């Protein structure tokens, strides 16, 4: 009964904002997601006409939940970073050393806000150089709105779950993406794997909140880790290049300092 009452109160709050609720039975109240700060950010996005409807959950990650949404006739993805349960230490590793966020206060709320802004910025830089990523639309506090990648209301599958007819071609595209990201966008994804790549009409890199600039103290280490992850996944699926050869071609360095 308490859960149903809380669900009703939550639905009423969203409706008061002017937001239409889709698939209400799938939109379960999660106290660690829809807190007062998140509801306020949602209200601001609805008020500014960025959102008109919210639907069911698309995915639940370590730090964020993603929901299906609508902006008029446009399908969007609503990424909400959880403030109460965010892994402060894990996030700090990627924020500290990033010159763009050197003034961030060391508390959980401000770190999550900075992280959301950071992902928006990283996606924008990647998109500018032609990397296939979800289009970043707007961010507010701990909420990031992006274009929805999928067919109808069904998201594209992660690479690990997709049926790929030509894995060698996909592998080459990914190595090219890593190169372009590093040399043109001056970014390193820093968590690239078969879990953070979607595959539909083409491949897409996602989850770029942790991505760092090329001058980050750990950028080269993260770059090598990305290369190793992609090689690990494709090793039994097609011919691959050696880790160090890819690394050297991208960075023009022969080795990486431990």
Question: What residues fall within each predicted segment?
Answer:
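Polybasic/polar functional segments that serve as interface/processing modules
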Residues: 17-18, 22-30, 222
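Long, low-complexity intrinsically disordered regions enriched in Ser/Thr/Pro/Gly
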Residues: 1-17
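Intrinsic disorder/low-complexity detector
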Residues: 6-7, 29, 36-43, 47-48, ...
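Short, glycine/acidic-enriched loop or turn micro-motifs at the edges of active sites
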Residues: 82, 150, 194, 199, ...
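C-lobe/activation-segment region of protein kinase-like
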Residues: 170, 182-189, 200-258
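Conserved ATP-binding subdomain of kinase catalytic cores across diverse folds
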Residues: 22, 29-155
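Short small-residue beta-strand/loop micro-motif enriched in glycine and branched aliphatics
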Residues: 154-159, 213-216
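Conserved kinase catalytic-core helix
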Residues: 107-135, 139-140, 156-190, 195, ...
């Amino acid at each position: 009964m308490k859960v149903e009452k809380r669900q009703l109160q939550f639905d009423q709050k969203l409706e008061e904002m002017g937001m239409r609720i889709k698939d209400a039975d799938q939109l379960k109240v999660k106290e660690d997601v829809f807190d007062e700060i998140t509801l306020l950010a949602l209200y601001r996005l609805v008020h500014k006409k960025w959102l008109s409807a919210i639907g069911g959950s698309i995915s639940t990650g370590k730090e964020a939940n993603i929901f299906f949404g609508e902006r008029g006739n446009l399908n969007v993805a609503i990424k909400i970073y959880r403030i109460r349960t965010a892994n402060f230490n894990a996030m700090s590793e990627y924020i500290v050393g990033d010159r763009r966020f050197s003034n961030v206060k060391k508390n959980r709320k401000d770190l999550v806000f900075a992280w959301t802004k950071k992902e928006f910025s990283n996606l924008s830089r990647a998109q500018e150089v032609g990397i296939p990523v979800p289009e970043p639309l707007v961010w507010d506090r701990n909420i990031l709105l992006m274009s929805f990648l999928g067919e109808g209301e069904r998201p594209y599958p992660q690479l690990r779950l997709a049926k790929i007819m030509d894995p060698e071609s996909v592998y080459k595209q990914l190595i090219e993406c890593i190169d372009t990201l590093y040399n043109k966008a001056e970014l390193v994804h820093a968590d690239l794997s078969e879990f953070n790549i979607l595959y539909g009409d083409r491949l897409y890199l996602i989850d770029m909140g942790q991505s760092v600039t090329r001058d980050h103290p750990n950028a080269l280490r993260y770059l090598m880790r990305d290369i190793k992850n992609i090689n690990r996944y494709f090793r039994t699926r097609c011919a691959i290049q050696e880790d160090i050869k890819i690394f050297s071609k991208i960075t023009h360095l022969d080795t990486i300092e431990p």
